[in-house]
Amino acid sequence: MSKNLSNLEYHADERLGRSTAWKLVTTCPAIVRHEMLNPRPSDSLALIMGSCTHAATLEPDLLDKEFAIKPEEIDGKSSRTNHYKEVFESMQSRNPNIQWLNRSDYRTCVDMAESAREHPLLKTYLSDQETMIEQTGFFECKGVACKVRPDLYNPGAGVVIDIKTTQDASEQGFRKSIRRFGYAFQASYYLNALRILGLKPKQFVFLCVEKTPPYLTAAYEISTAEVERELIRVHDACDTYKKCMDTGIWPGYGDDIKTLTLGNYATNGLLSISQTAEHFNVSRTWVYRMIKTHKIPTLARGKRKMLDMTDFKNAMRWDAEGGKNGKTT
């Protein structure tokens, strides 16, 4: 693992990273190839604020070397004037490694970071000199040159921590983020990478901080079974990437006509109590008990209660594992 690579340099490196690997298994190679040849700008406000929050959380002493507050006025001139634009462009050219934020956005990043740093888990490992912060590792998986850059890794405890800024850090809210952004895949990718690099990670923790005051935090881990299951898709991504690189062929969705079965998606993934009982071959009473025990959210559709099939499947697994309220024991 190396500390000699900046965040911008890491993202510019052409080795296969987690984000590209995730896109290979959730979109198609043609889209991945297009994005490789036409990279998205790295100066979007969301990306800059995310990077600023990470820097302020993990390495606040280095924050001023990478981020600065954009002046509201220059020589009494507003940002709409030519004088302001000329002087600010000169400031940017003299400081090519600095990313600029307005005062309000910069303050938000710092406030989120301060909240995250107060979480007992992060506070413990940030005070440990053994902890590795944003170090880069290069490795090979399935014959593919890959890269990894965990936010924080403590080799003594074997703990990996990834900082996530989110609109909703509640259990239900973060479950949705896990599905939408492939966080189980990310955990599997990182743990696999660190093991290939000769390290011994034991636990992958997501430390979430909300983007709005009071910037609440929460820490989550995904069940070991789900993370291990995602390793199949990590390997699939590497195999697909290698095949595309070797052949120069980056296929799209295919030209064949495909037959789609809507199934549960016809009701947007929702089932009534009776449908849930029938689908899972259980009693209605047992369904109600699971809803109450695991706090499964329901939605009223007329006189019927509807619930998400994925939420119920997760609850069944937690129940079988002896867990409760979305946490395994």
Could you describe each region identified by the protein language model?
Residues 239, 243, 292-293, 303, ...:
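Residue-level detection of the helix-turn-helix DNA-binding "recognition helix"
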Residues 167-181, 223-224, 295:
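Short helix/strand-bridging catalytic loops that position acidic/His residues to coordinate divalent metals
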Residues 310-329:
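A short, Lys/Arg-enriched interface patch at domain edges and termini
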Residues 150-176, 190:
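Conserved catalytic cores of phosphodiester-cleaving nucleases, focusing on short active-site segments
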Residues 281-306:
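Major-groove DNA-recognition helix of helix-turn-helix-type DNA-binding domains
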Residues 181, 189-267:
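Metal-dependent nuclease catalytic regions and adjoining charged, substrate-binding loops involved
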